[in-house]
Protein backbone atom coordinates (compact mmCIF):
# COMPACT_ATOMS: atom_id res chain seq x y z
CA UNK A 1 0.00 0.00 0.00
CA UNK A 2 1.06 3.59 -0.50
CA UNK A 3 0.17 7.05 0.67
CA UNK A 4 0.33 9.46 -2.25
CA UNK A 5 0.38 13.22 -1.93
CA UNK A 6 0.25 15.88 -4.62
CA UNK A 7 1.44 19.34 -3.58
CA UNK A 8 0.76 22.44 -5.66
CA UNK A 9 0.73 20.48 -8.93
CA UNK A 10 0.30 22.50 -12.10
CA UNK A 11 0.76 21.54 -15.73
CA UNK A 12 0.84 23.67 -18.86
CA UNK A 13 1.14 22.77 -22.51
CA UNK A 14 2.63 25.87 -24.14
CA UNK A 15 0.39 28.71 -22.93
CA UNK A 16 -2.52 26.43 -21.97
CA UNK A 17 -2.76 25.62 -18.27
CA UNK A 18 -4.52 22.27 -17.87
CA UNK A 19 -3.92 21.70 -14.13
CA UNK A 20 -3.97 24.64 -11.72
CA UNK A 21 -2.09 24.50 -8.39
CA UNK A 22 -3.74 21.26 -7.30
CA UNK A 23 -3.34 19.57 -3.91
CA UNK A 24 -4.51 16.03 -3.16
CA UNK A 25 -3.75 13.54 -0.39
CA UNK A 26 -4.56 9.85 -0.86
CA UNK A 27 -4.43 7.51 2.13
CA UNK A 28 -3.01 4.00 2.33
CA UNK A 29 -5.42 1.47 0.85
CA UNK A 30 -7.95 4.10 -0.25
CA UNK A 31 -10.08 3.83 -3.38
CA UNK A 32 -10.28 7.35 -4.74
CA UNK A 33 -11.92 8.31 -8.02
CA UNK A 34 -11.12 11.43 -10.01
CA UNK A 35 -14.23 12.21 -12.03
CA UNK A 36 -14.93 15.03 -14.44
CA UNK A 37 -15.89 15.89 -18.02
CA UNK A 38 -13.57 15.26 -20.96
CA UNK A 39 -10.69 17.72 -21.09
CA UNK A 40 -10.70 18.62 -17.39
CA UNK A 41 -7.13 17.32 -16.83
CA UNK A 42 -7.88 14.11 -14.91
CA UNK A 43 -5.91 11.76 -17.20
CA UNK A 44 -3.01 14.21 -17.30
CA UNK A 45 -2.99 14.20 -13.50
CA UNK A 46 -2.89 10.39 -13.45
CA UNK A 47 0.03 10.39 -15.90
CA UNK A 48 1.88 12.82 -13.65
CA UNK A 49 1.42 10.47 -10.69
CA UNK A 50 2.63 7.55 -12.84
CA UNK A 51 5.69 9.46 -14.02
CA UNK A 52 4.65 9.41 -17.67
CA UNK A 53 4.25 13.19 -17.67
CA UNK A 54 6.29 15.86 -15.90
CA UNK A 55 4.44 18.51 -13.93
CA UNK A 56 5.28 22.17 -14.52
CA UNK A 57 5.39 22.93 -10.78
CA UNK A 58 4.80 21.07 -7.53
CA UNK A 59 5.78 17.76 -5.96
CA UNK A 60 4.56 14.18 -6.15
CA UNK A 61 5.22 12.19 -2.97
CA UNK A 62 4.86 8.43 -2.51
CA UNK A 63 5.11 7.27 1.10
CA UNK A 64 6.75 10.58 2.03
CA UNK A 65 9.40 10.42 -0.70
CA UNK A 66 9.45 13.06 -3.46
CA UNK A 67 9.51 11.17 -6.77
CA UNK A 68 9.63 14.10 -9.22
CA UNK A 69 12.85 12.79 -10.76
CA UNK A 70 12.06 9.09 -10.36
CA UNK A 71 11.39 7.19 -13.58
CA UNK A 72 7.95 5.67 -14.10
CA UNK A 73 9.41 2.15 -14.01
CA UNK A 74 10.90 2.81 -10.57
CA UNK A 75 7.78 4.23 -8.85
CA UNK A 76 6.32 0.75 -8.26
CA UNK A 77 2.90 1.73 -9.62
CA UNK A 78 0.75 -0.37 -11.94
CA UNK A 79 -1.44 1.24 -14.57
CA UNK A 80 -4.51 -0.09 -16.38
CA UNK A 81 -5.59 1.88 -19.45
CA UNK A 82 -8.77 2.22 -21.46
CA UNK A 83 -6.92 0.21 -24.12
CA UNK A 84 -6.00 -3.12 -22.53
CA UNK A 85 -2.68 -3.28 -24.46
CA UNK A 86 -2.40 -7.08 -24.45
CA UNK A 87 0.13 -8.83 -26.68
CA UNK A 88 -2.05 -10.52 -29.33
CA UNK A 89 0.48 -13.26 -30.16
CA UNK A 90 0.88 -14.38 -26.54
CA UNK A 91 -1.46 -16.49 -24.42
CA UNK A 92 -3.13 -15.06 -21.33
CA UNK A 93 -0.57 -16.80 -19.14
CA UNK A 94 2.31 -15.37 -21.16
CA UNK A 95 0.75 -11.88 -21.03
CA UNK A 96 0.56 -12.13 -17.25
CA UNK A 97 4.16 -13.35 -17.03
CA UNK A 98 5.69 -10.52 -19.09
CA UNK A 99 5.91 -7.83 -16.36
CA UNK A 100 7.21 -10.33 -13.81
CA UNK A 101 9.88 -11.67 -16.15
CA UNK A 102 11.08 -8.14 -16.85
CA UNK A 103 11.34 -7.41 -13.12
CA UNK A 104 12.62 -10.74 -11.79
CA UNK A 105 14.93 -12.05 -14.54
CA UNK A 106 18.21 -10.42 -15.53
CA UNK A 107 18.96 -9.59 -19.15
CA UNK A 108 21.03 -12.75 -19.56
CA UNK A 109 18.35 -14.89 -17.89
CA UNK A 110 15.82 -13.61 -20.43
CA UNK A 111 18.16 -14.13 -23.37
CA UNK A 112 17.27 -17.12 -25.64
CA UNK A 113 19.36 -20.28 -25.21
CA UNK A 114 21.99 -18.59 -23.01
CA UNK A 115 19.39 -17.85 -20.35
CA UNK A 116 18.43 -21.50 -20.11
CA UNK A 117 21.79 -22.28 -18.54
CA UNK A 118 21.73 -19.53 -15.90
CA UNK A 119 21.68 -21.17 -12.43
CA UNK A 120 18.81 -19.20 -10.81
CA UNK A 121 16.53 -18.96 -13.82
CA UNK A 122 14.39 -22.00 -13.02
CA UNK A 123 13.62 -20.98 -9.43
CA UNK A 124 12.73 -17.45 -10.55
CA UNK A 125 10.44 -18.78 -13.27
CA UNK A 126 8.72 -21.07 -10.77
CA UNK A 127 8.04 -18.01 -8.60
CA UNK A 128 6.65 -16.14 -11.63
CA UNK A 129 4.33 -19.03 -12.52
CA UNK A 130 3.15 -19.25 -8.91
CA UNK A 131 2.23 -15.56 -8.81
CA UNK A 132 0.45 -15.78 -12.16
CA UNK A 133 -1.54 -18.76 -10.93
CA UNK A 134 -2.54 -16.91 -7.74
CA UNK A 135 -3.63 -13.82 -9.68
CA UNK A 136 -5.61 -15.85 -12.19
CA UNK A 137 -7.46 -17.62 -9.37
CA UNK A 138 -8.31 -14.29 -7.72
CA UNK A 139 -9.64 -12.91 -11.01
CA UNK A 140 -11.30 -16.22 -11.96
CA UNK A 141 -9.50 -16.49 -15.30
CA UNK A 142 -7.64 -19.78 -14.72
CA UNK A 143 -9.62 -21.44 -17.51
CA UNK A 144 -8.47 -18.73 -19.93
CA UNK A 145 -4.71 -19.05 -19.41
CA UNK A 146 -4.06 -20.90 -22.69
CA UNK A 147 -6.20 -18.60 -24.82
CA UNK A 148 -4.99 -15.60 -26.79
CA UNK A 149 -6.55 -12.10 -26.46
CA UNK A 150 -8.44 -12.47 -29.74
CA UNK A 151 -10.36 -15.39 -28.24
CA UNK A 152 -11.56 -13.38 -25.23
CA UNK A 153 -14.59 -11.16 -24.64
CA UNK A 154 -14.17 -7.52 -23.65
CA UNK A 155 -14.74 -8.28 -19.98
CA UNK A 156 -12.24 -11.14 -20.03
CA UNK A 157 -9.62 -8.93 -21.69
CA UNK A 158 -10.23 -6.32 -19.01
CA UNK A 159 -9.64 -8.89 -16.26
CA UNK A 160 -6.40 -10.00 -17.92
CA UNK A 161 -5.22 -6.38 -18.09
CA UNK A 162 -5.95 -5.96 -14.38
CA UNK A 163 -4.20 -9.27 -13.68
CA UNK A 164 -1.07 -8.16 -15.52
CA UNK A 165 -0.93 -5.12 -13.24
CA UNK A 166 -1.81 -7.17 -10.18
CA UNK A 167 1.00 -9.76 -10.45
CA UNK A 168 3.56 -7.01 -9.98
CA UNK A 169 2.23 -6.39 -6.45
CA UNK A 170 2.51 -2.60 -6.85
CA UNK A 171 2.12 -0.09 -4.04
CA UNK A 172 -0.84 1.44 -5.92
CA UNK A 173 -3.04 0.82 -8.96
CA UNK A 174 -3.70 3.65 -11.42
CA UNK A 175 -6.75 3.07 -13.63
CA UNK A 176 -7.56 5.33 -16.57
CA UNK A 177 -11.16 4.70 -17.69
CA UNK A 178 -10.67 0.91 -17.86
CA UNK A 179 -14.37 0.17 -18.43
CA UNK A 180 -15.03 2.64 -21.25
CA UNK A 181 -14.84 0.00 -23.99
CA UNK A 182 -17.42 -2.30 -22.38
CA UNK A 183 -21.17 -2.36 -22.97
CA UNK A 184 -23.49 -1.03 -20.26
CA UNK A 185 -24.39 -4.38 -18.70
CA UNK A 186 -20.82 -5.65 -18.51
CA UNK A 187 -19.68 -2.30 -17.14
CA UNK A 188 -22.01 -2.71 -14.14
CA UNK A 189 -20.66 -6.22 -13.54
CA UNK A 190 -17.03 -5.10 -13.75
CA UNK A 191 -17.63 -2.23 -11.32
CA UNK A 192 -18.53 -4.82 -8.70
CA UNK A 193 -15.51 -6.97 -9.58
CA UNK A 194 -13.04 -4.08 -9.28
CA UNK A 195 -14.55 -3.02 -5.94
CA UNK A 196 -14.26 -6.59 -4.65
CA UNK A 197 -10.66 -6.79 -5.88
CA UNK A 198 -9.83 -3.62 -3.97
CA UNK A 199 -11.30 -5.05 -0.78
CA UNK A 200 -9.28 -8.25 -1.22
CA UNK A 201 -5.95 -6.57 -2.06
CA UNK A 202 -6.29 -3.63 0.37
CA UNK A 203 -4.09 -1.62 -2.00
CA UNK A 204 -4.38 2.04 -2.96
CA UNK A 205 -6.53 2.53 -6.07
CA UNK A 206 -6.62 5.79 -8.06
CA UNK A 207 -9.37 5.56 -10.64
CA UNK A 208 -10.06 8.12 -13.38
CA UNK A 209 -13.40 8.27 -15.18
CA UNK A 210 -15.95 10.61 -16.73
CA UNK A 211 -18.72 8.24 -15.62
CA UNK A 212 -20.28 9.48 -12.39
CA UNK A 213 -21.96 6.11 -11.79
CA UNK A 214 -18.54 4.46 -11.50
CA UNK A 215 -17.38 7.17 -9.10
CA UNK A 216 -20.48 7.00 -6.91
CA UNK A 217 -20.60 3.20 -6.63
CA UNK A 218 -16.92 2.30 -6.22
CA UNK A 219 -15.15 5.06 -4.31
CA UNK A 220 -14.20 5.66 -0.70
CA UNK A 221 -13.83 9.28 -1.79
CA UNK A 222 -14.32 11.02 -5.10
CA UNK A 223 -12.74 14.19 -6.45
CA UNK A 224 -14.88 16.20 -8.86
CA UNK A 225 -12.51 17.91 -11.29
CA UNK A 226 -13.30 20.64 -13.80
CA UNK A 227 -11.08 23.02 -15.76
CA UNK A 228 -7.92 21.74 -14.09
CA UNK A 229 -9.17 22.17 -10.52
CA UNK A 230 -10.71 19.88 -7.91
CA UNK A 231 -14.02 21.51 -7.01
CA UNK A 232 -14.92 19.08 -4.24
CA UNK A 233 -13.29 16.10 -2.53
CA UNK A 234 -15.52 14.03 -0.28
CA UNK A 235 -17.42 10.76 0.04
CA UNK A 236 -19.92 9.92 -2.73
CA UNK A 237 -22.78 10.40 -0.26
CA UNK A 238 -21.67 13.91 0.69
CA UNK A 239 -20.99 15.01 -2.87
CA UNK A 240 -24.40 13.84 -4.03
CA UNK A 241 -26.36 15.24 -1.09
CA UNK A 242 -24.22 18.27 -0.18
CA UNK A 243 -22.51 19.54 -3.35
CA UNK A 244 -20.32 22.54 -2.63
CA UNK A 245 -21.29 24.39 -5.81
CA UNK A 246 -23.98 24.38 -8.45
CA UNK A 247 -21.45 23.00 -10.97
CA UNK A 248 -20.85 19.92 -8.82
CA UNK A 249 -24.59 19.52 -8.21
CA UNK A 250 -25.34 19.59 -11.95
CA UNK A 251 -22.51 17.21 -12.86
CA UNK A 252 -23.28 14.51 -10.27
CA UNK A 253 -26.64 12.82 -10.60
CA UNK A 254 -28.63 11.30 -13.45
CA UNK A 255 -30.95 12.78 -14.49
CA UNK A 256 -29.46 16.15 -13.60
CA UNK A 257 -30.65 18.11 -10.61
CA UNK A 258 -33.47 20.56 -11.31
CA UNK A 259 -32.28 24.16 -10.98
CA UNK A 260 -35.00 26.81 -10.67
CA UNK A 261 -34.94 30.57 -10.31
CA UNK A 262 -35.82 31.57 -6.78
CA UNK A 263 -35.93 34.38 -4.27
CA UNK A 264 -35.26 34.61 -0.54
CA UNK A 265 -37.40 37.50 0.69
CA UNK A 266 -37.25 39.82 3.69
CA UNK A 267 -39.64 37.61 5.67
CA UNK A 268 -37.41 34.58 5.37
CA UNK A 269 -39.54 32.84 2.76
CA UNK A 270 -38.00 30.90 -0.10
CA UNK A 271 -40.05 31.36 -3.24
CA UNK A 272 -40.11 29.97 -6.77
CA UNK A 273 -42.31 31.56 -9.46
CA UNK A 274 -43.76 33.77 -6.71
CA UNK A 275 -44.97 30.70 -4.76
CA UNK A 276 -43.72 30.19 -1.21
CA UNK A 277 -42.14 26.75 -1.01
CA UNK A 278 -40.66 26.86 2.50
CA UNK A 279 -39.83 29.12 5.43
CA UNK A 280 -37.71 26.55 7.26
CA UNK A 281 -34.47 27.36 5.40
CA UNK A 282 -32.54 30.23 6.98
CA UNK A 283 -30.05 32.00 4.73
CA UNK A 284 -27.55 34.72 5.54
CA UNK A 285 -28.46 36.94 2.59
CA UNK A 286 -31.71 38.02 0.97
CA UNK A 287 -32.18 38.26 -2.78
CA UNK A 288 -32.13 36.16 -5.92
CA UNK A 289 -30.99 32.55 -5.59
CA UNK A 290 -30.99 29.29 -7.53
CA UNK A 291 -33.04 26.49 -6.00
CA UNK A 292 -31.91 22.90 -6.58
CA UNK A 293 -34.01 19.77 -6.11
CA UNK A 294 -33.23 16.31 -7.43
CA UNK A 295 -35.86 14.44 -9.52
CA UNK A 296 -36.38 11.72 -6.89
CA UNK A 297 -37.27 14.35 -4.28
CA UNK A 298 -40.34 15.56 -6.18
CA UNK A 299 -43.74 13.92 -6.58
CA UNK A 300 -47.13 14.44 -8.20
CA UNK A 301 -49.96 15.34 -5.82
CA UNK A 302 -53.58 16.47 -5.88
CA UNK A 303 -54.24 20.16 -6.46
CA UNK A 304 -55.70 20.88 -3.02
CA UNK A 305 -52.38 20.56 -1.18
CA UNK A 306 -50.17 23.45 -0.09
CA UNK A 307 -46.75 24.50 -1.36
CA UNK A 308 -47.20 23.00 -4.78
CA UNK A 309 -46.98 24.28 -8.32
CA UNK A 310 -48.38 23.32 -11.67
CA UNK A 311 -46.64 21.79 -14.67
CA UNK A 312 -47.37 20.22 -18.04
CA UNK A 313 -45.98 16.84 -19.10
CA UNK A 314 -44.02 17.16 -22.34
CA UNK A 315 -42.27 13.76 -22.34
CA UNK A 316 -42.54 10.44 -20.46
CA UNK A 317 -39.30 8.45 -20.14
CA UNK A 318 -40.11 4.87 -19.16
CA UNK A 319 -37.14 2.95 -17.75
CA UNK A 320 -39.16 0.04 -16.39
CA UNK A 321 -38.42 0.42 -12.69
CA UNK A 322 -38.81 4.21 -12.87
CA UNK A 323 -40.55 6.76 -15.01
CA UNK A 324 -39.06 10.20 -15.55
CA UNK A 325 -41.62 12.88 -16.32
CA UNK A 326 -40.28 15.88 -18.21
CA UNK A 327 -42.39 18.92 -17.34
CA UNK A 328 -42.59 22.59 -18.20
CA UNK A 329 -43.41 24.93 -15.31
CA UNK A 330 -43.94 28.65 -14.83
CA UNK A 331 -45.96 28.92 -18.05
CA UNK A 332 -43.36 27.00 -20.03
CA UNK A 333 -40.38 29.14 -19.03
CA UNK A 334 -38.51 26.33 -17.24
CA UNK A 335 -38.22 22.57 -17.52
CA UNK A 336 -37.91 20.06 -14.70
CA UNK A 337 -37.74 16.27 -14.36
CA UNK A 338 -39.71 14.28 -11.78
CA UNK A 339 -38.77 10.68 -10.98
CA UNK A 340 -41.67 8.40 -10.03
CA UNK A 341 -42.62 4.77 -9.60
CA UNK A 342 -44.68 3.57 -12.60
CA UNK A 343 -47.70 2.73 -10.43
CA UNK A 344 -47.96 6.35 -9.28
CA UNK A 345 -48.14 7.85 -12.77
CA UNK A 346 -49.81 5.06 -14.74
CA UNK A 347 -52.69 7.32 -15.80
CA UNK A 348 -50.58 10.29 -16.91
CA UNK A 349 -49.91 11.21 -20.52
CA UNK A 350 -48.06 13.85 -22.52
CA UNK A 351 -50.02 17.10 -22.41
CA UNK A 352 -51.54 16.50 -18.97
CA UNK A 353 -51.53 19.30 -16.40
CA UNK A 354 -50.20 18.01 -13.08
CA UNK A 355 -49.36 19.35 -9.61
CA UNK A 356 -45.89 18.92 -8.13
CA UNK A 357 -44.63 18.94 -4.55
CA UNK A 358 -41.09 18.56 -3.32
CA UNK A 359 -39.38 17.42 -0.13
CA UNK A 360 -38.46 20.59 1.78
CA UNK A 361 -35.64 18.77 3.59
CA UNK A 362 -33.89 18.04 0.29
CA UNK A 363 -33.90 21.56 -1.15
CA UNK A 364 -30.52 23.12 -1.98
CA UNK A 365 -30.05 26.86 -2.40
CA UNK A 366 -27.18 28.40 -4.36
CA UNK A 367 -26.15 32.04 -4.37
CA UNK A 368 -25.50 34.13 -7.49
CA UNK A 369 -21.90 32.85 -7.58
CA UNK A 370 -23.08 29.23 -7.54
CA UNK A 371 -22.01 28.42 -3.97
CA UNK A 372 -24.22 26.19 -1.83
CA UNK A 373 -25.87 28.28 0.92
CA UNK A 374 -27.63 25.41 2.69
CA UNK A 375 -24.78 23.09 3.73
CA UNK A 376 -21.52 23.05 5.65
CA UNK A 377 -19.94 24.90 2.69
CA UNK A 378 -21.49 28.23 3.74
Q: How would you name each of these model-derived features?
A:
Residues 4, 19-21:
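Conserved structural motif at the start of ABC-family nucleotide-binding domains
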Residues 35-37:
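The feature captures the beta-strand-to-loop junction immediately N-terminal to the Walker
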Residues 50:
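Helix-to-loop junction immediately C-terminal to a conserved catalytic motif
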Residues 56-59, 227:
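Conserved coupling/switch loops of ABC nucleotide-binding domains, chiefly the family-specific signature
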Residues 58-66:
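Conserved ABC transporter NBD signature motif
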Residues 91-247:
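ABC ATPase nucleotide-binding domains
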Residues 267-378:
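Non-catalytic connector elements of ABC transporters
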Amino acid sequence: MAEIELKNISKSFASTEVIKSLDLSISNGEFITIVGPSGCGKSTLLRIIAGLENQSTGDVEIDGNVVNNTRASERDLAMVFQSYALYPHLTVQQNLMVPLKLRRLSFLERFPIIGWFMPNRRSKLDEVVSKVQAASETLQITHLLERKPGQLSGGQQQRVAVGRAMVREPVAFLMDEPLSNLDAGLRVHMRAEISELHRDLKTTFIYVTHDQAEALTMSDRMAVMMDGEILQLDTPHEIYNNPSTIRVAEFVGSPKINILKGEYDEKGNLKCFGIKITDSIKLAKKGNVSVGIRPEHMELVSSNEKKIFKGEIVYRENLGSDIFLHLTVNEGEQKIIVRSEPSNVINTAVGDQVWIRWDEQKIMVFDVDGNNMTTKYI
